[in-house]
């Protein structure tokens, strides 16, 4: 990779300052239950790359050592990583705020029937993605039936308190 810092020193580019890192985004893998045409990481059900246990342990140690406040989980569908629930539970036990970038349809997948309840029990913040409010557009981008499955996922989360007034669960 080309080092561009020396080039910046020769310009009037303003100095860049930063404070301590308080949010860490971690990609847990490229496996996903969808195959979206617009996916920037080309995630799909055929992808197998995933964060392993050793890396997860390093991540948890880093969170503690650097006093990271927020862990932002992404993928693919981060929930399909075999260590997802353990990572969430252990990060929450450290007092770390956890965000899950959820495609909503994962909540309806076989083997994930209790996922919404797990997320609520752990007070995980959900960043839900739905690329459009029109069924035809969503299904064209993400696959047939994704719009309705996404709404079903939202209903599950709403029933648990996500997005409801006076609830501490963030959607």
Mark where each language-model region is.
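Radical SAM/AdoMet-radical enzyme domain recognition
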Residues: 53-72, 81-171
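Conserved alpha-helical substructure of the radical SAM core
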Residues: 2-75, 79-97
């Amino acid at each position: 990779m080309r080092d561009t810092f020396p080039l910046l020193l020769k310009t009037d580019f303003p100095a860049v300052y930063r404070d301590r890192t308080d949010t860490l985004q971690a990609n847990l893998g490229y496996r996903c239950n969808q195959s979206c045409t617009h996916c920037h990481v080309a995630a799909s059900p055929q992808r197998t790359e995933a964060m392993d246990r050793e890396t997860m342990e390093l991540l948890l140690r880093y969170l503690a050592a650097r006093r990271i406040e927020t862990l932002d989980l992404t993928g693919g569908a981060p929930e399909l990583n075999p260590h997802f629930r353990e990572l969430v539970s252990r990060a929450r036990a450290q007092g770390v705020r956890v965000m899950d970038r959820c495609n909503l349809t994962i909540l309806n997948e076989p083997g994930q029937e209790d996922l919404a309840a797990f997320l609520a029990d752990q007070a995980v913040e959900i960043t839900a993605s739905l690329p459009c409010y029109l069924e035809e557009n969503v299904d064209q981008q993400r696959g047939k039936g994704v719009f309705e499955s996404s709404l079903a996922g939202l209903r599950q989360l709403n029933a648990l308190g996500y997005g409801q007034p006076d609830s501490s669960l963030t959607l």
